[in-house]
């Protein structure tokens, strides 16, 4: 489960303020005051400034020469990030106040909040979080000053941090990890919390900053949970305790965020997967490996079948490839050079032995495939290809396996075994732009068919430390994707260094019903794999040419898409996807036979329908099937049977009584056949009532 970043009421997340001048020798805070800008107590209070080089500065910053700065308000993304980082410091101070033996890890701001890692003797309990939150409120009320201090040398820092082993490790850190807020600036610095009256140091932390002026500039915060976490995310390192929290520019914004968290918890696909009997993760199978139950299997089948139909209409050819392959294939593709950490260990098989146990023929390493693209390259290469065959669009629901660390495995949205709706398109350079344009339209149209309609694009470019091919090839591929993305009319956000090792990509980012952003489809342009695999086609002039390869996963994976849709619809899938589309609920046992006749008629039209013959009372049956998110509930009592009718009952408790049987069947069949994504209600379902 994740929760979206939300702008404050009335704010758009941007900072509309104009630059101001900070005279040499004057604090930024003084210039803010001189300009008449709010400094505390309002959602748009200025918390830091950005200098001409784009660096965020404390309000206590004093430039050596006149400087033009942009004020950063609390209700902007940067402003919230600074508030959250400062709140993380307050949390760390509170932890060391209440747990003096605690050692400090890292404490960065993250989307919608912050966390801090600690080495402690026992895991934190809910009571501990309450006590810590109480102590934090005391610190906020005290108005402690955040005071930046520069270490004269690393030796001075090491001496001061002698009892903080994790901070000592960070003194020499050069990883560039964005979560490491302690170092990374031009200087090695600490931030001390000072008593506002005496200016005595109360507490401090290794940190590059920036921070808000005082703890009173934290308007609203809350601790949300704790969990175990490996130091620096590496399971080979020590296991620490992580406390998560959130902080906002106003109590109103915090309250709105808490409401979103609570709604996200209600929609959590892991919770709904159990309640609706959709899927599970048996311990006997292993972490990140899902099994789909019959109801979940129906939803999955419908997702796949509709996708297959659309791909057939769009000219794709269906292929299939095995789950394991010799190591050499992934040497050729480059996966073992650039992606080995994401692959499961090899299996050595096919060895032959002599009678005395000595090896006659050594075995070979085989790998579970992490991607389908190398195998699709082999399909293309299996015979000679002509320009007349291009573009060649290959499509597969291919199951792949990726070694995700146990700490990041999360329900269906981060798994180890996943089925990708994987397409690879081979085309000429002349066809490339048109193919990308039509592909992007196809992706957006298909996602819209499933009820996801709020999109923007992200352009991921080369990681300078992790790529194959020449700079010229990467530049051409990146420019083409940027051109196609811009033509789409959607917002195109840069993602520097975010591409896979073989080519740049456009990813379709989707917002769900709660406004959360999910990366969905990816489109990657690849000039490198055709060269690595020696792919060629015969051009119109008889010469041998290399095709361009386009990688595309539309859902990302079936599992992840299933989880996202479950949360988007809060488990109430559109009727065309619902595992049970209609249920007959008799008032009494004598009405069962009639409802079974109605059900038989619906089944003849392909409707997935059941009749509840349990011993429960009708009211309890209605509650049960409402909780099971069945879109159409059909009630029948004496009057309905006599009139050859049913009464519709919907999940929002609305009802249509006395609907003639034929009209009821027609309405349900019509709703499903039109693939309506809205939840049916008495207002939306147009049907003639007999009453």
Swiss-Prot record:
The keyword tRNA-binding applies. GO terms for biological process: threonyl-tRNA aminoacylation. Binds 1 zinc ion per subunit. It comes from Mycobacterium marinum (strain ATCC BAA-535 / M). The gene is thrS. This is Threonine--tRNA ligase. The lineage of its organism: Bacteria, Bacillati, Actinomycetota, Actinomycetes, Mycobacteriales. Its EC number is 6.1.1.3. Homodimer. Disulfide bonds: none annotated.
